């Protein structure tokens, strides 16, 4: 295996934020820009030789190009195997699930979350650790320091990998496995929730739902889980095909950018009982009822209050956590349940140490993110599935 070393010079401003490095596509597409940042990640790893890396993104513009570059660089960095989502697709919570289930060393997720996509819009990259969660500040600070002094990056010359076909191929000595991006994640959700109960709800003639995937990454997941495994009518999922520019929309599940969904639920003639939407990389969510929207602060409180309805959590919650700007509704629920409620800075990565220590089971933040200890990222479809089982109509099934 021949490794090519390419001389480079630092770019300014490659400092990761709370969710990795995000810049305009035109910035990332500069020769060496992505390569410098990826090499700076790899230069701060120890023990990755022969190990597994998980790779994928939300399908936005530049996703496919970036994946081919990262695969070649991963081979040069000594990884033994890369699991990459088919067509380059892998939602953020699904990536976390795959990392954890497959015992991967870590993962690279390509997304700018709820920011718009396209040649003139945004792209992003972040590294997740072996626990499936975002890298901590010590690691990201070290990556930034490396970007300021980098002088070369390394790759293995190779033809592009066919990302549209499931199967195995090689770059040098490294095995590349193109995987079904939905399988491990769907299996995990089914282990947490009573899918038979949800399916009964979705089959009721007096209950209709709509899920707006916003032409983002959760489209294939929602089609496979809601319409496939749970039997919701075809057409329940709208805007379900991931597009590089999200169909010209802004993949942020809020009343402004998901106005069509909100309007449909407010229309008494629509026949809809329940609505939901998720963002670019599938980790945020919005829950909509008939003429009302569930605020993120209330969503995590409702989820915690109804934990006994969910098989995976019915034996009790270790504790709960919320970000500082999130309202105190969760605190009230925790007090009633007699469990601890922790407050963290903004950024999902701050929940990671609490989850890993077994101190909390459920987490929520002000920016439409909710999740639990099943992965180390917030999780849009998890929140939708959980909410299904808390609906009064479902308890009567």
Residue ranges and their predicted role:
Residues 15-25, 217, 364-366, 381-382:
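Conserved phosphate/anionic-ligand binding catalytic regions in large, soluble enzymes, centered on
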Residues 87, 138-183, 289-374, 379-381:
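Proline/glycine-rich low-complexity loops and linkers
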Residues 24, 52-58, 111, 128, ...:
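Short glycine-rich or small-residue beta-strand-to-loop segments that form or flank ligand, phosphate
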Residues 2-11, 32, 119-269:
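Gly/Ser/Thr-enriched, mixed-charge loops and adjacent short helices
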Residues 38-53, 196-204:
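Glycine-rich phosphate/diphosphate-binding loops that line cofactor/substrate pockets in enzymes
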Residues 54, 58-121, 224-287:
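N-terminal small/polar loop signature for handling phosphorylated ligands or for N-terminal nucleophile
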Residues 387-393:
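Conserved small/polar residues in nucleotide/adenosyl-binding loops
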């Amino acid at each position: 295996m021949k490794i090519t070393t390419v001389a480079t010079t630092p770019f300014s401003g490659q400092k990761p934020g709370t969710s990795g490095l995000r810049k305009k596509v035109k910035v990332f597409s500069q020769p060496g820009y992505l390569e410098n940042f990826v090499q700076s990640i790899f230069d701060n790893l120890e023990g990755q030789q022969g190990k597994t890396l998980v790779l994928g993104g939300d399908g936005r513009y530049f996703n496919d190009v970036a994946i081919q570059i990262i695969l070649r660089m991963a081979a040069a960095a000594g990884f033994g195997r890369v699991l990459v989502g088919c067509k380059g697709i892998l939602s953020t919570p699904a990536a976390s699930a795959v990392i954890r289930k497959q015992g991967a060393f870590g993962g690279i997720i390509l997304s700018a979350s709820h920011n718009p996509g396209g040649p003139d819009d945004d792209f992003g990259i972040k590294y997740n650790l072996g626990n499936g969660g975002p890298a901590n500040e010590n690691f990201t600070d070290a990556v930034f320091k490396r970007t300021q002094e980098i002088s070369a990056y390394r790759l293995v010359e190779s033809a592009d990998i066919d990302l549209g076909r499931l199967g195995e191929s090689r770059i040098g000595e490294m095995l590349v496995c193109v995987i079904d991006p939905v399988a491990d994640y769907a299996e995990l959700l089914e282990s947490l929730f009573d899918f038979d109960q949800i399916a009964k709800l979705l089959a009721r003639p007096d209950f209709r739902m709509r899920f707006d995937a916003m032409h983002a990454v959760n489209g294939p997941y929602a089609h496979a889980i809601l319409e496939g495994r749970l039997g919701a009518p075809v057409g329940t999922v709208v805007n379900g095909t991931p597009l590089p520019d999200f169909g010209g929309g802004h993949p942020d599940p809020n009343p402004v950018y998901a106005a069509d969904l909100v309007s449909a639920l407010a229309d008494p003639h629509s026949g809809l009982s329940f609505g939901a939407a998720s963002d670019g990389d599938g980790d945020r969510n919005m829950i909509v009822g008939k003429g009302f929207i569930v605020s993120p602060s209330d969503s995590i409180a409702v989820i915690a209050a109804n934990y006994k309805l969910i098989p995976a959590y019915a034996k009790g919650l270790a504790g709960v956590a919320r970000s500082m700007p999130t309202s105190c509704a969760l605190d009230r629920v925790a007090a009633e349940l007699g469990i601890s409620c922790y407050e963290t800075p903004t950024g999902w990565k701050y929940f990671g140490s609490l989850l890993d220590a077994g101190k909390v089971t459920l987490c929520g933040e002000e920016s439409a993110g909710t999740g639990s200890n099943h992965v180390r990222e917030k999780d849009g479809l998890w929140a939708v599935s959980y909410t299904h089982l808390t609906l009064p109509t479902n308890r009567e099934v």
